[in-house]
Regions:
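A transmembrane-helix-recognition feature enriched in membrane-embedded lipid enzymes
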Residues: 1-57, 109-114
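Conserved H-X4-D acyltransferase segment
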Residues: 5-12, 41-97
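Non-catalytic C-terminal accessory region of glycerolipid acyltransferases
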Residues: 128-255
């Protein structure tokens, strides 16, 4: 039963990606460029969540309602984080995403057409160029989503944060909006085939202003953002059924 359920879930993801991804490539070029892409992306995310039996509840959306040109910082537990964030976060969204995703047929093509920002973590020069592109998106009133851990956790616990997102916020003066996701680790784990239906809680925190700060404040600002997400995540986990809110042992995460 678990195998068939997982197989069905992957089938839903593939079909939805094709059904929404192909027309979204063309929609991304309709003036104003990239603006017609987001409804397709949100539709794709919501169809995948509904088709795989994932229920999402978000709180705190009003805290980010007026934060145009903000940087969303979110923890990264699962592939499903992308669907969840597209479904619930307000604003004109763009992801900072790892470069390899842009090579995925249909998905990568649509991301490139829509103006998502590729990041090559192994190339510092390219990473700096990506921050410049993301800064331009922010100045245009878009909201950039960043996973500051830069990878999905293998244990369900929060990983150390990298500084790139903080540098972007400092460069543009855009506030950081912390976002905590709880429950996706129980639905799908990094590198795993198994997919389970379940409930996800998302909690959006108060924007963290960066006005008056400089690059010298990057370590303190990174720590503050991480602490905010840690606290929000604990609150979100507390609203989940115990089996979904708890993190499995590291050995279970590798299965």
């Amino acid at each position: 039963m678990r195998f068939l359920r997982s197989l069905w879930a992957w089938f839903v993801i593939v079909v939805a990606t094709l059904a929404f991804g192909i027309p979204s490539i063309f929609a991304a070029f309709v003036p104003p460029r990239g603006e017609w892409y987001l409804p397709f992306a949100r539709g794709w995310a919501r169809v995948v969540l509904a088709g795989t039996g994932v229920r999402v509840r978000a709180s705190g959306s009003d805290r980010a309602a007026a934060a145009d040109g903000c940087v969303y910082f979110a923890n990264h537990e699962s592939l499903f984080d992308i669907f969840v964030l597209l479904a619930v976060l307000p604003g004109r969204l763009r992801f900072l995403a790892k470069k390899s995703l842009f090579s995925v047929p249909v998905l990568g093509w649509s991301m490139a057409a829509a103006g998502y920002v590729p990041v090559d973590r192994d190339d510092r020069r390219q990473a700096a160029e990506s921050l410049e592109i993301a800064a331009a998106r922010l100045r245009g009133g878009m909201r950039v989503i960043i996973f500051p851990e830069q990878t999905r956790t293998r244990t369900g616990e929060l990983l150390p944060f990298k500084k790139g997102g903080v540098l972007l916020a400092l460069k543009t003066g855009a506030p950081i909006v912390p976002v905590a996701i709880a429950g996706t680790f129980a639905i799908q784990q990094r590198g795993g085939f198994w997919l389970s239906p379940g409930r996800v809680e998302v909690e959006i925190g108060e924007p963290i202003p960066v006005g008056g700060m400089t690059v010298a404040d990057r370590h303190a600002l990174t720590a503050r953002a991480r602490e905010a997400i840690e606290a929000l995540r604990a609150s979100a986990r507390g609203r989940l059924p115990s089996a979904e809110g708890s993190s499995p042992a590291p050995s279970a995460a590798r299965d």
